[in-house]
Amino acid sequence: MSSGGLLLLLGLLTLWEGLTPVSSKDRPDFCELPDDRGPCRGIFHAFYYNPDQRQCLEFIYGGCYGNANNFKTIDECKRTCAA
């Protein structure tokens, strides 16, 4: 293969890498945890990452305990688990 062809291939692979979503091995382990309301009875809109749907979803957080897959904003969830 010519050097021009190799450069083109390298460029395409680099572009592909930038377009592919983060694999599960690159995201924190807590992103795999289920949504967890916790035992308290508050009503707080929060977001968690759903690994089956590969997106951040809203849920109601009770205000205490729960787990680390719990974000105040969808943007924070996406930056941490889906980006």
Curated annotation (Swiss-Prot):
SMART domains assigned: KU (SM00131)
What are the coiled-coil residue ranges? none
Site residues by UniProt (Reactive bond for trypsin):
41-42
Tissues/organs with expression: Expressed by the venom gland.
Q: Which GO terms describe its cellular component?
A: extracellular space
Q: Which residues form the signal peptide?
A: 1-24
Q: Which family does it belong to?
A: Belongs to the venom Kunitz-type family.
Name of the protein this chain belongs to? Kunitz-type serine protease inhibitor blackelin-2
